[in-house]
Amino acid sequence: MAAALFSSNGEEAIGRNIDIGQVDIQSSPEKDLGEFYEIEKTVEFIQRNAAQKVALQFPDDLLLDSVKVARKLEEATGAKTYILGDTSYGSCCVDEVAAEHVKANVLVHYGRACLSPCCRLPVSYVFGRKAVNMDLCAEAFLSHYRDTESHVVVLSDVVYDHALGELAKRIRSAYPNVIFSKLTSCGETASPDEIVKFGRRFSPDLRLWPESYGIFYVGGEGSTLNNLMLTWPRCSFFSFNPFTGEGRTEGLHVNRALMIRFYLIERARDAHVFGILVGTLGVSDYLSALKHLKNIIHLAGKKSYMFSVGKLNPAKLANFPEIDVFVLVACPENSLLDSSEFYKPVVTPDEMEIACNPAREWHGYCITNFRELLPGGSAYVEFPETDPSDAHHTDVSLITGNLRSSHLTVAETLEKDSDTSLVQRNSKTALAQMSSAASYLASRSWQGLDKALGQTPVVKAVEGRKGIAIAYEDEICS
């Protein structure tokens, strides 16, 4: 029972409700199987890597076809295939840990993907070629961008990326300033004039980007579109949903979403104890990110604890009431978590840094890729050296209106040895050092059993009560 509070079991995976509002979960016909799942491309990938064991990672909505695909690949390559269903975290991430359990040589990821860089196994992505009505898509673009000189970047959900080539043929001749994004692959280096975000790359006119650009997005509502809008809130967005065949102007809720993120930053500024949530084990540099966050929190004079609990839900995190704010280290697709259902706020590493690092300021947009915050990243900001005279200062909380104290760690105190690792207390148990954990313990109505050493007489063990709770032997039953 206790283990279920911290990790997901098999019954939960089987009984999980899938959002099928815009998902076609019917099994694909045999004649379309090879095209939809790109069987020939996958066979070439397996043979090129001389793989004997192949892990096939399917999301829930594509599991119906998993056995058919596995059989076709085994017949064509002779390799042994292993189907990976329920993932440890988000289905958009490559589950390298599960692939290593079966000692796979390569991994094939099916369905939507966050395209986060991986470092352990060769990975091939098969997004699934979802159908797009190109007539309606082109019509939506032409009706919205009537000025042929408009500067537009065309982005898409990965499952519709195959349709961008056809869209380019229809509109590029009339719109010279339209740019079509391309998906990136591991190992590619970006040129100085390129923008690389969320596994997509494009080269806008940097003198006009982003204020003078519009973004035409092919895909439905979801985390991908939300991330794009919160990353570039100064761009005007227009989306075409292939599932409904309709286009619409986006952006009415962006300002509200940014206000919510700013509120979470203020909650993080008020926090004394942070919980670092491990939301991925496959994205490259996640260990460096965990170490970086722990260091930033320590330099800010606050406490941190690390948790790895698999898929997140309110019940799991409610087991840690001592935590003021949780920091989620995950892929960009899963970083912006709606924490309204959780008892404590869940923020991104960028929001945590804004709250703890005096040198980092709120920039008006979201950074969901934690790799950009690491040393050498495009958004890295070094924690400033703290002068001992400025180590303690106060400001006013915008949420509670109360004064809050900051206790920045002076650089010299980071060097600790065995002689200074303990603090000797006096007989009066006077407070020797401020501790957020101790202050939380003092505020609790029940602080645990008091041993009261030396205050109670020592007695021999006596025979206790017998029976069950409903009726002990010494109780009179009616």
Swiss-Prot record:
Binds 1 [4Fe-4S] cluster per subunit. The cluster facilitates the reduction of the catalytic iron-sulfur cluster in the dph1 subunit. One of its GO terms (molecular function) is 4 iron, 4 sulfur cluster binding. It comes from the Eukaryota. InterPro entries: DHP2 (IPR010014), DPH1/DPH2 (IPR016435), DPH1/DPH2_1 (IPR042263), DPH1/DPH2_3 (IPR042265). [4Fe-4S] cluster binds at residues 93, 114, 331. Pathway: Protein modification; peptidyl-diphthamide biosynthesis. It holds the Pfam family Diphthamide_syn. Keywords: Iron, Iron-sulfur, Metal-binding. Component of the 2-(3-amino-3-carboxypropyl)histidine synthase complex composed of dph1, dph2, dph3 and a NADH-dependent reductase. Belongs to the DPH1/DPH2 family. DPH2 subfamily. Required for the first step of diphthamide biosynthesis, a post-translational modification of histidine which occurs in elongation factor 2. Dph1 and dph2 transfer a 3-amino-3-carboxypropyl (ACP) group from S-adenosyl-L-methionine (SAM) to a histidine residue, the reaction is assisted by a reduction system comprising dph3 and a NADH-dependent reductase. Facilitates the reduction of the catalytic iron-sulfur cluster found in the dph1 subunit. This is 2-(3-amino-3-carboxypropyl)histidine synthase subunit 2.
